[in-house]
């Protein structure tokens, strides 16, 4: 091993992209919410999840956790010059509306809201019914 390279890792500096319009992909499941903000081509600008922000267990699936995740992702994306977004929502979770409201409150102009939840045409067998 080289003498001066012990314990140092080379990290590329994040370059600041200038993007005015992008897409926000909100995946809201029963257990977690993930918000990814991309440019119009699909390259990721920023992302955040409820679990990544420190929410654990049943608090991860709350609308407040989704709101905080969307707010964090929006602030990071606005550093790249983002002003308006199209929102694509996927999944049955409780954080869908809260995340959209949070993106608007962060100062992003929402131009489109589209539900892209995948619907099976009688595909996989669903999990068994819960008995409580």
From Swiss-Prot:
Keyword Amino-acid biosynthesis tagged: no
Record-level GO BP terms: translation
Region of interest (Disordered), residue spans: 1-20
Record keywords, A-Z: Ribonucleoprotein, Ribosomal protein, RNA-binding, rRNA-binding
Record-linked Pfam families: Ribosomal_S11 (PF00411)
Assigned protein family: Belongs to the universal ribosomal protein uS11 family.
Subunit record text: Part of the 30S ribosomal subunit. Interacts with proteins S7 and S18. Binds to IF-3.
Function recorded in the entry: Located on the platform of the 30S subunit, it bridges several disparate RNA helices of the 16S rRNA. Forms part of the Shine-Dalgarno cleft in the 70S ribosome.
Name this polypeptide is given: Small ribosomal subunit protein uS11
Organismal lineage: Bacteria, Bacillati, Bacillota, Clostridia, Eubacteriales
Name of the coding gene: rpsK
């Amino acid at each position: 091993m080289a003498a001066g390279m012990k314990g140092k890792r080379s990290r590329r500096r994040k370059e600041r992209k200038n993007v005015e319009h992008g897409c926000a992909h909100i995946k809201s499941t029963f257990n977690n919410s993930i918000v990814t903000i991309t440019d119009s081509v699909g390259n990721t600008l920023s992302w955040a999840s409820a679990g990544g922000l420190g929410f654990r267990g049943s608090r991860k699936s709350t609308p407040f956790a989704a709101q905080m995740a969307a707010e964090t992702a929006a602030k990071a994306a606005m550093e790249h010059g983002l002003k308006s977004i199209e929102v694509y929502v996927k999944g049955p979770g409780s954080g869908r509306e809260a995340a959209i409201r949070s993106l608007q409150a962060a100062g992003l102009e929402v131009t489109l809201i589209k539900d892209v939840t995948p619907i099976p045409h009688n595909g996989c067998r669903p999990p068994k019914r819960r008995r409580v």
